[in-house]
Regions:
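A short, N-terminal amphipathic alpha-helix
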Residues: 18-28, 66
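Generic N-terminal amphipathic, Lys/Arg-enriched alpha-helix
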Residues: 1-9
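Active-site anion-handling motifs in enzyme catalytic cores
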Residues: 14
Length: 169
């Protein structure tokens, strides 16, 4: 048999073992697991994975649409910067929309206030050696730093996102 490259081989037994571990954690803690489509958007195994996961999270409109249409469950959307068109589309199907800044939240709040909304928080440290994704680097604009400004937004939010472990083995 001739296989044309590139191709991906997925060991379903190993994948299933990891999914079963997640299921145990879900049952014992009440935690939810969402698939980060930026890291793994191989829809060939979505039928298996959706049995063990609660939905997807995405970093673009098209990833969010993929998760909504092909995976199901909860659809979480996050992007460093949204266009008005992206927000309008996401308002139609995303369950949770996470903003990178308070100014984004202010700009789009009226259109999405019926959704679960969140803000990305800059923790001020990072475990990553990848400078572009390091929220603690100088002049970083990855998330909200001002604790007082964040406190003023609490009534509009249903959650926070901490993202500090990108590109870390």
């Amino acid at each position: 048999m001739q296989i044309t490259t590139p191709y991906y081989i997925i060991d379903e037994k190993r994948l299933l073992r990891n999914l079963q571990i997640m299921q145990q954690i879900r049952e014992q803690s009440g935690a939810k697991f969402v698939l980060a489509l930026k890291c793994f958007s191989t829809w060939a195994v979505f039928d298996l994975m959706r049995q063990y996961m609660d939905g997807t999270t995405s970093s673009s409109l098209y990833e969010a649409r993929l998760g909504h249409e092909k995976f199901g469950g909860e659809t979480h959307a996050y992007c460093v910067g949204y266009s008005p068109e992206d927000i309008h589309a996401l308002a139609g199907f995303a369950d949770k929309i996470i903003f990178n800044s308070i100014s984004q939240l202010d700009t789009y709040y009226n259109e999405v206030q019926a959704k679960h909304l969140g803000l990305r928080i800059n923790p001020g440290f990072s475990c990553s050696h990848f400078d572009l994704a390091d929220p603690a680097r100088r002049y970083s604009r990855l998330g909200v730093v001002d604790k007082e400004a964040l406190q003023a937004q609490v009534s509009r939010l249903s959650g926070l996102m901490f993202h500090y472990n990108c590109e870390n083995d």
